[in-house]
């Protein structure tokens, strides 16, 4: 079984949030810095690393030196059927391959929640069931929040920040995801007037994002891709 039943209150756990907004051969993700900063400075206790700090060496170092019960990765990802080496999560200067997840020692100390704020991280095939999410569970992670299709970084910003906000109030992962998705459906999570509006507060966005077209985050494209794999509690 990929799931280990049992409940642990995630609220005392710290989050390690890492991501990249600039890439040499892939489109930029300009909303990732806002995602990481909002999570670690307004929603949850933890540390964040952007771009140059998002390396495999630093990821391993942070996991070995500190007890992070939650790991959040915001970047590009690609799942390709076939060899596990073909599927990857993009780090700053390298790719984390599907078959390398187990080497991160996510079970010692145990990671209770892995958030993969990237494209198609819950997609799999018979050789790699549930893709990165399934591999993370096999590596010892209790639950993984991942995606079933290509997602926009604006949608990921809205969904993940609302998810952490809900998780701090109702510390059951599946219920926090349900409430976050409902908040997006109802239009309580939106980007307008250079502000990110969540269910109970708003966050000012950097001036460089002011010219970006604001999508309708209530559209299922932006919220329905996210799914929780593993322990629902």
Describe the predicted segments one by one.
Residues 156-233:
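An often Trp-containing, charged/polar helix-loop segment at the C-terminal end
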């Amino acid at each position: 079984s990929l799931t280990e039943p049992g409940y642990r209150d995630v609220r005392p756990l710290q989050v390690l949030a890492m991501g990249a907004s600039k890439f040499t051969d892939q489109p930029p993700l300009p909303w990732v810095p806002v995602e990481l900063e909002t999570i670690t400075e307004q929603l949850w206790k933890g540390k964040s690393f952007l771009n140059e700090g998002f390396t495999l060496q630093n990821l391993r170092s942070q996991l070995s030196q500190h007890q992070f019960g939650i790991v959040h990765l915001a970047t590009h990802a690609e799942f390709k059927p076939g060899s596990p080496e073909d599927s990857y999560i993009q780090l700053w200067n390298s790719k984390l391959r599907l078959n390398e997840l187990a080497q991160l020692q996510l079970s010692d100390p145990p990671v209770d929640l892995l958030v993969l704020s990237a494209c198609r991280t819950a997609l799999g095939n018979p050789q790699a069931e549930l893709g990165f999410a399934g591999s993370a569970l096999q590596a010892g992670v209790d639950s993984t929040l991942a995606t079933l299709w290509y997602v926009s970084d604006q949608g990921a910003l809205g969904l993940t920040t609302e998810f952490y906000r809900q998780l701090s109030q109702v510390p059951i992962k599946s219920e926090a995801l349900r409430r976050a998705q409902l908040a997006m459906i109802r239009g309580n999570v939106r980007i307008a007037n250079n502000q990110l509006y969540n269910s109970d507060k708003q966050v000012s966005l950097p001036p460089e994002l002011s010219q970006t077209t604001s999508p309708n985050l209530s559209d299922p494209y932006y919220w329905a891709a996210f799914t929780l794999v593993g322990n629902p509690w």
